[in-house]
C-alpha cells in the first residue's frame, strides 16, 4: 500500500511527464528501434540540412531534437451539440460516460481533436506548428459544415514535445546527485530521470540509454535551447 501511495504522489508531482501526449513519446523512446534524432558530421552540414527555424541550434552537440507532438487549443466561439457532431462527422466518437468530448481524427495532417460542448478544442499529434494550425482549421471547417456557427479563433500552442538520442549511456545516479535541485530520479517508479530546467522552462526525461524527451515548450526554439544547455551535463555523466 505504501508503494501505491508513493507512486500516486510521484505521478501527481510529475503530471506533465504522465500526460498522454508526453507519455506516448517517452514510451516509444524507451523501446529499441525508435527513430533517432538527426546527427550530422559537421557544423556546415547542420547549417545546410536544417530549415531556417532550426539553424544555429546545434553548434555544440551536432544533434537537432525531433519534434514529436504539438498540442494546441482553439476556441470555436459557439456551443456545440456533441451528439450531432459525432453523428454527422467521419472518424468521430462520443461516449459521454467515459469522456465529455467528441474525439475526432483526420489523416492529413495526422492528428486527433478533442471537441468540447463549450466550443473549446484541443488538437494533438501534429509534428510541426504549421501542421497543427492546418489541422485545427480543418476541424473547425468540419464543425461549420455540420451546421454550427464555428469560428477559428484564439489558436495557441500549449505544449511541444521533442526527442533525441545522444548515442551514449548516462550515469543517472551521478546526475541526480550532482543536480539534485533540478532532478527527480526514482528508478523503482519511473525508468528515467526527470530534470526540470529553469530557463528555458522545460522538463527533460533522461534515460540511461541516452534517449532524451523534452516537453513543456511553447516554441520549438525552447526545445533546441534546452537540449544544448543539457548536452554538456550529459557528456559529463557519460558512462565510460
UniProtKB/Swiss-Prot annotation:
Principal localisation: nucleus
Sequence repeats: 67-143, 157-234
Keyword terms: DNA-binding, Nucleus, Repeat, Transcription
GO molecular function: chromatin binding; disordered domain specific binding; DNA binding, bending; DNA-binding transcription factor binding; RNA polymerase I general transcription initiation factor binding; RNA polymerase II core promoter sequence-specific DNA binding; RNA polymerase II general transcription initiation factor activity; RNA polymerase II-specific DNA-binding transcription factor binding
GO cellular component, one term: transcription factor TFIIIB complex
Localization (cell): Nucleus
Transmembrane segments: none
Matching PROSITE patterns: TFIID
Secreted found in the keyword field: no
Biased composition (Basic and acidic residues): 44-57
Pfam families named in the record: TBP
GO biological process: DNA-templated transcription initiation; negative regulation of DNA-templated transcription; nucleolar large rRNA transcription by RNA polymerase I; positive regulation of transcription by RNA polymerase II; regulation of transcription by RNA polymerase III; RNA polymerase I preinitiation complex assembly; RNA polymerase II preinitiation complex assembly; RNA polymerase III preinitiation complex assembly
Region (Disordered): 21-61
HAMAP family: TATA_bind_prot_arch
Protein's job: General transcription factor that functions at the core of the DNA-binding general transcription factor complex TFIID. Binding of TFIID to a promoter (with or without TATA element) is the initial step in preinitiation complex (PIC) formation. TFIID plays a key role in the regulation of gene expression by RNA polymerase II through different activities such as transcription activator interaction, core promoter recognition and selectivity, TFIIA and TFIIB interaction, chromatin modification (histone acetylation by TAF1), facilitation of DNA opening and initiation of transcription.
Subunit annotation: Binds DNA as monomer. The 1.2 MDa TFIID complex is composed of TATA binding protein (TBP) and the 14 TBP-associated factors. One copy of each TAF1, TAF2, TAF3, TAF7, TAF8, TAF11, TAF13, two copies of each TAF4, TAF5, TAF6, TAF9, TAF10, TAF12, and three copies of TAF14. Interacts with TFC8.
Protein family according to the UniProt entry: Belongs to the TBP family.
Name used for this protein in its record: TATA-box-binding protein
UniProt source species: Saccharomyces cerevisiae (strain ATCC 204508 / S288c) (Baker's yeast)
The gene coding this protein: SPT15
Amino acid at each position: 500500500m505504501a508503494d501505491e501511495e508513493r507512486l500516486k504522489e510521484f505521478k501527481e508531482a510529475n503530471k506533465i511527464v504522465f500526460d498522454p501526449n508526453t507519455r506516448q513519446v517517452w514510451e516509444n523512446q524507451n523501446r529499441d528501434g525508435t527513430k533517432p534524432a538527426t546527427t550530422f558530421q559537421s557544423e556546415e552540414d547542420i547549417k545546410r540540412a536544417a530549415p531556417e527555424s532550426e539553424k544555429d541550434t546545434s553548434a555544440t552537440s551536432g544533434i537537432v531534437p525531433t519534434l514529436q507532438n504539438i498540442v494546441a487549443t482553439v476556441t470555436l466561439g459557439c456551443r456545440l451539440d456533441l451528439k450531432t457532431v459525432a453523428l454527422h462527422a467521419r472518424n468521430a466518437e462520443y461516449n459521454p460516460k467515459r469522456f465529455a468530448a467528441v474525439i475526432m481524427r483526420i489523416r492529413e495532417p495526422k492528428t486527433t481533436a478533442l471537441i468540447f460542448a463549450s466550443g473549446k478544442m484541443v488538437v494533438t499529434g501534429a509534428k510541426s506548428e504549421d501542421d497543427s494550425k492546418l489541422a485545427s482549421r480543418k476541424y473547425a471547417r468540419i464543425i461549420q459544415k455540420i451546421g454550427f456557427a464555428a469560428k477559428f479563433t484564439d489558436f495557441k500552442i500549449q505544449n511541444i514535445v521533442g526527442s533525441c538520442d545522444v548515442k551514449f549511456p548516462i550515469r543517472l545516479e551521478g546526475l541526480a546527485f550532482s543536480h539534485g535541485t533540478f532532478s527527480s530520479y526514482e528508478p523503482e517508479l519511473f525508468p528515467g530521470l526527470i530534470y526540470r530546467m529553469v530557463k528555458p522552462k522545460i522538463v527533460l526525461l533522461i534515460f540511461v540509454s541516452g534517449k532524451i524527451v523534452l516537453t513543456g515548450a511553447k516554441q520549438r526554439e525552447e526545445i533546441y535551447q534546452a537540449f544544448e544547455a543539457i548536452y554538456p551535463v550529459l557528456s559529463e555523466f557519460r558512462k565510460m
